[in-house]
A protein has these predicted regions:
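C-terminal scaffold of the Radical SAM
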Residues: 1-251, 309
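A short, conserved structural fragment
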Residues: 264-276
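Minor-groove-contacting beta-hairpin "wing" of winged helix-turn-helix DNA-binding domains
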Residues: 277-281
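Short amphipathic alpha-helical interaction segments
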Residues: 248-266
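Intrinsically disordered or highly flexible coil/loop and linker segments, enriched in small
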Residues: 208, 234-235, 271, 301-304
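The C-terminal cap of the DNA-recognition helix in HTH/winged-HTH DNA-binding domains
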Residues: 13, 231, 261, 267-268
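Short, amphipathic alpha-helical interaction segments positioned at domain boundaries
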Residues: 283-310
């Protein structure tokens, strides 16, 4: 919203090879409702300049915002497709006013019903499929020759706070900036959300971490299983056990492995459930968050603490 041509030239001079532009929506009415400024420069102009530099471009959108309709979001996706981004992401708006108080303001503007929100995603997915994009994981769409598509075909897809990436280039994520979250193998750490404090600490050479969470061994196991399900729509218990150097039973013990509940999902056509593995069906892939949540011990009796899957 604030960058002019000079700013973009400075970024290009840094040698970045991929840019992700957080658009949210092209509809000015929607942007005003969520107190978001439109881009200072036409997004088409920015994308073209970044392409000229040899960089790849991702466009990120959010569906489920106040003021959005299936038709308006379809127009936004159509405009994005015309730019032919290398990747396009459709994030579901997470309404968690019990965590972010300011979100209560958006309730006054009226949030789309859940059924309409789901239709926004389905319509976008249909548009992108017709345009030749491949659906990756929960929310990414990529060109057929993209590294993510190749990783998915090899069941080597990985996901972190930045989105999806091939497992072969997976590394720990170190956060820079206010409120950024570092994702480490054994812990998570979040930087302060206070801008003044962040500037003060960095100028003094101090860490800006405000809070953290150390993962217990079983949580690290559960994270691997859920990540595999969300990335590759598939978990083989023996393969997972070998990767983690534990038994298949120990893998299941780290989960909320509720056979009757999982069997109900299988009966509904969302998953295939076998003694050797669990896999999402094509019909079940849009509901991968729901399946993952059913396996997560942290979600038991805590559904209201987290954003809704759709």
């Amino acid at each position: 919203a604030y960058l002019n041509d000079e700013h973009w030239e400075q970024l290009i001079g840094c040698g970045f090879t991929r840019y992700s532009l957080g658009i949210q929506d092209f509809d000015d009415n929607v942007l005003r409702t969520v107190n978001r400024r439109p881009s200072l420069l036409p997004v088409e102009h920015i994308v073209e300049r970044l392409r000229q530099s040899g960089a790849k471009v991702n466009l990120d959108f959010i569906y489920g915002l106040p003021g959005q309709t299936v038709q308006s979001f379809a127009r936004t996706i159509a405009r994005a497709i015309d730019m032919r981004p290398n990747r396009l992401v459709t994030f579901s708006y997470a309404h968690v006013p019990y965590i972010y108080n300011r979100q209560r303001i958006l309730e006054k503007a009226g949030l789309p019903p859940e059924a309409e929100k789901m239709r926004m995603f389905e319509q976008a997915a249909e548009q992108l499929a017709r345009a030749g994009y491949c659906h990756i994981g929960m929310d990414h769409f990529v060109e057929p020759n993209d590294d993510l598509q190749q990783a998915l075909e090899r069941k080597q897809l990985h996901r972190n706070f930045q989105g999806y990436c091939p497992r072969r280039i997976t590394a720990q994520v170190y956060a820079l900036g206010v409120s950024g979250i570092s994702q480490l193998d054994v812990a998570y750490a979040q930087n302060t959300k206070d801008v003044a404090r962040y500037i003060q600490h960095t100028s003094e050479g101090r860490l800006c971490i405000e809070r953290g969470y150390a993962l217990q061994p079983w949580q690290r196991v559960a994270r691997e299983v859920i990540e595999s399900l969300m990335c590759n729509y598939y978990v083989a218990w023996t393969d997972m056990a070998e990767r983690l150097n534990i038994s298949a039973e120990e893998v299941k013990e780290a989960l909320n492995y509720d056979v009757p509940a999982l069997q109900q999902m299988a009966d509904d056509g969302l998953i295939t459930l076998e003694p050797t593995h669990i896999a999402l069906t094509e019909a079940g892939s849009p509901f991968v968050r729901n399946v993952a949540a059913a396996l997560d011990k942290m979600m038991i009796n805590n559904n209201n603490r987290f954003s809704k899957p759709v």
